[in-house]
């Protein structure tokens, strides 16, 4: 049995792991356009329920992930000068790059073939494959190419967001609501490893325009967010990595 997986992100790699475990004799190959250690963004977050599923379906990768993650039980909400902490909400954060390397190594252990810097633009090359898995991300070219078959519904939400990072340590999943002269901004922040945290900034389209963010470079946008959230960053810098402003798409 031949299985081709297009896309070597976390979803494609985890699919490869589970398929190879279920079909040990199958030839499973993952095709990824980027290099093995390329990654965009910063940390990813998992709930306790997701961790339970990781442990259930592949204990070896689960234990490696939990060896690397930052764990917290609280949500801290900063609103109008007050802080509300709510316990009992277990989450963990993990570096996206670390997660990819863990899953790559686990897939190799099982005998999965990983081909990097291999851009697939036509799935017809896999005509002999018994199964093709499309895991090429939220902007999947294959989903668009076969729109008539898959019939996806893409709802582009109105709010703008930018994904940044910081060296600011955090002890809780942190939400900050900050009112500015232009309108409200929200920061969603969490630590994913020692010395590193993810900061996702969100605002409505009207506030986005009034704040002059349209057309700004990534660094200029980071500088503006650092000014707005200065008291929460506490002197720590904001980091960028493809941190352009975009809209949340909901895909069904």
Segments and roles (model prediction):
Residues 1-11:
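Beta1/beta-strand and adjacent pyrophosphate-binding region of the FAD-binding site
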Residues 18-41:
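Glycine-rich FAD pyrophosphate-binding loop
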Residues 86-89, 95, 171-250:
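Conserved FAD/dinucleotide-binding core of flavoprotein oxidoreductases
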Residues 24, 59, 230-234:
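Proline-centered flexible-loop/turn and helix-kink motifs
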Residues 11, 15, 36, 139:
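Conserved Rossmann-like nucleotide-cofactor binding loop
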Residues 161-172:
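Glycine-rich loop(s) and the adjacent beta-strand/alpha-helix scaffold that form part
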Residues 4, 27-29, 113:
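A structural signal for isolated positions on well-ordered beta-strands in alpha/beta enzyme cores
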Residues 48-163:
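Conserved N-terminal helical subregion
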């Amino acid at each position: 049995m031949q299985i081709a997986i297009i896309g070597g992100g976390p979803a494609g790699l985890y699919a490869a792991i589970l398929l190879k475990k279920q079909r040990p004799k199958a030839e499973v190959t993952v095709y990824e356009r980027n290099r093995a250690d390329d990654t965009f963004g910063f940390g990813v977050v998992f709930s306790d329920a997701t961790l339970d599923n990781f442990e259930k379906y592949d204990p070896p990768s689960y234990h490696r992930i939990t060896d690397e993650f930052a764990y917290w039980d609280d949500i801290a909400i900063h609103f109008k000068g007050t802080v509300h902490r709510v316990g009992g909400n277990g989450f963990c954060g993990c570096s996206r790059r670390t997660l990819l390397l863990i899953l790559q190594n686990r897939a190799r252990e099982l005998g999965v073939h990983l081909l990097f810097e291999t851009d697939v633009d036509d799935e017809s090359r896999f005509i002999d494959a018994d199964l093709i898995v499309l895991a090429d991300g939220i902007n999947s070219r294959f989903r668009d190419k076969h729109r008539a078959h898959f019939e996806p519904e893409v709802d582009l939400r109105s709010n703008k967001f930018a994904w940044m990072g910081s060296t600011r340590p955090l002890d809780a999943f942190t939400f900050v609501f900050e009112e500015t002269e232009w309108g409200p901004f929200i920061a969603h922040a969490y630590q994913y490893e020692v010395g590193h945290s993810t900061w996702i900034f969100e605002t409505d389209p009207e506030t986005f325009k009034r704040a002059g963010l349209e057309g700004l470079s990534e660094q200029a946008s980071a500088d503006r967010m650092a000014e707005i959230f200065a008291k929460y960053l506490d002197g720590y810098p904001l980091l960028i990595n493809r941190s352009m402003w975009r809209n949340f798409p909901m895909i069904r």
